[in-house]
Amino acid sequence: PIVLDYIMDSEVPKPCRHFIGRDKELEELYTMLEENRHVFLCGIAGIGKSELAKAYAKHYKKHYTNILYVEYTGNLHQDITDMDFIDDLPESTEQERFQRHNRFLRSLKSDTLLIIDNFNVTATQDSFLSVVLKYRCQILFTTRSKLDEYCTLPLKEIENMNALFQLASVFYSEADTYRATVEKIIETVHSHTFAVELAAKLLENGISTPDQLLTRLQVEKASFHNEDKIKIIKDGQSSKATYYSHIHTLFSLYTLSLEQQDIMCNMCFLPSTGISARIFAKWLELPTLNEINDLIETGFVQTTTRRTISLHPMIQEITLSETKPSVTRCHILLDSLQHICLMHGMEVDYYKKLFQTIGNIIELIEKDDIPKYLLFLENAFPYMDNYNYHKGMNGIIQELKCLLKTKSIGTDSDRALLLDFQATLETKPEKAIKLEKDALAQIENIT
């Protein structure tokens, strides 16, 4: 465990307390990792890949000297750079940090297990995968992608009805009384782990009776199947759609208050690793954590032992399409983040999560108020510069370039700032000076 003292924030989150029905898979995983060193645990969203990985770490922790956990954010090179080593110097560049971290990870032997959670890309999309696969430690990836060229363990539904019924009874106290109906509900949602959990929580909250829920799911399933007869499952897409439709039905049975819908809408931008509930409540100016706690009870909002909250990936996708977060709708969140970024002298210890959230906003938000959005980006950039957060700075430059291409968008000062930002990241002094001169020329037009 020496490594955990050296790399902060890299311990494996604990699996949920009610982890059941996967004994065979745990053993298979152990054998595969022993024989192949690197294993990709694949399966559709909500089937329990991340939970199995966490349970594996807990179950076999005596077999390893170190177990490290990294949540994939879309770029392996960046995720390794962003690991928190205790002797990282604040003034070191991203490149230096990356080289030190990579060198250290390369030195680890097979008594270390590295878990890379939510690696949802193809091998060609993340060119750095081939480098990571040269590490000598054991690596367990969880992924929704089909990566057939590697050693994979496909995770299917839990077949044992008793185990699934047990899971439902953890969340639904009257499951025994309505056993027959609950089992039918489990069959109707195709034994999909996350759907079973949501259904049980829905019943526990008294929002509908087991019979009502079963009828509703069956009706939805029948209409879905009629539309879907033509599409024979070619790529697993249609089965994925079926699961989404179940989750969607369960989601729509809740009548969420406007405040709760708003919270969910803003939570779409949180990094998948989650953020402290208190910090998030402060960003949204919520007087209490009550609404968030109610959402945790429904199962839509996930929480870990560290009191961090995030949306389940399936719920995030549904929330995005249902609530359509926009600059106007999420103005309180944007104002709060902008406010933090304007306090240049003030350091926040969660800056990485803050910047990941800003990155997700750029990617997902509807830009329905361009002047406000431009100001938001222009205030975020210098704050990222304080922390040498180049990934985010590049993201802002790309977004500004894209927006300011259109003549009617933005002002001369917006264009001057973009040139100034590009100069900040330019490594060649003569190029940087030229960019600054161009920026000044833009401003002369104004004065």
Model regions: which residues?
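Alpha-helical sensor/transducer elements of the RecA-like P-loop NTPase core
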Residues: 1, 51, 82-83, 134-198, ...
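Charged, amphipathic alpha-helical interface modules that flank catalytic cores or transmembrane segments
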Residues: 1-28, 32, 54-55, 211-222
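Post-nucleotide-binding-loop coupling segment downstream of the phosphate-binding loop, primarily
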Residues: 15-20, 24-109
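C-terminal boundary/linker of central alpha/beta nucleotide-binding cores
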Residues: 54, 197-204, 247-323, 330-331
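Loop-to-helix "switch" segment enriched in basic
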Residues: 164, 202-260
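A eukaryote-biased feature capturing mid-to-C-terminal, repeat/solenoid-rich segments of large proteins
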Residues: 206-226, 259-261, 320-345, 350-354
